[in-house]
Amino acid sequence: MFPGMGGVGGRGMNPAKMKQMMKQMGIDVKELKDVEEVVIKTADSNIVIENANVTIMTVQGSETYQIVGDVKEVPKSLEIPAEDIKLVMEQTGVSEEEARNALKNSNGDLAEAIVALSSA
C-alpha cells in the first residue's frame, strides 16, 4: 500500500516506520491505560465491556475510541421508588402489589399508572 513500507518478505510494516508515517499524516494513537471496564448505557440495557483495551486515535482534532474486550449486555431493571408506590396506592386505593405492577406497566409514569388503575 505504501512504497518502501514492506516488512519481511513483503508482509506487514515496520512498526517504527508506521508510527512515523502516521505522525506525518497528523494521526496520533494512544492506548488508555488501566481500563477495567467500559459501560455503554442505552434506553433498554447497558453494554458492559470487561477486560477492555481502549485505543484513542486523534485525526485532525477528532477523537475516535476503539474498544476491545469481553462484551455482555445487561438489561436495565426499572426501579420504582417507594414514594411512587405509596402515592399510587393513596390515589387509587389499591394494594402495594397492584400499585407496583401499574407503575412497571407504565414504565414508572405516575399519572399513567393512576389513570390505568382508576379506569379499571
From Swiss-Prot:
SMART domains annotated for this entry?
NAC (SM01407)
Single annotated GO MF: RNA binding
Bilayer-crossing residues are none
What does the UniProt keyword field contain?
Protein transport, RNA-binding, Transport
Q: What are the GO BP annotations of this UniProt entry?
A: protein transport
Complex formation:
Homodimer. Interacts with the ribosome. Binds ribosomal RNA.
Please give the name of this protein: Nascent polypeptide-associated complex protein
Q: Which species does the entry assign this protein to?
A: Methanosarcina mazei (strain ATCC BAA-159 / DSM 3647 / Goe1 / Go1 / JCM 11833 / OCM 88)
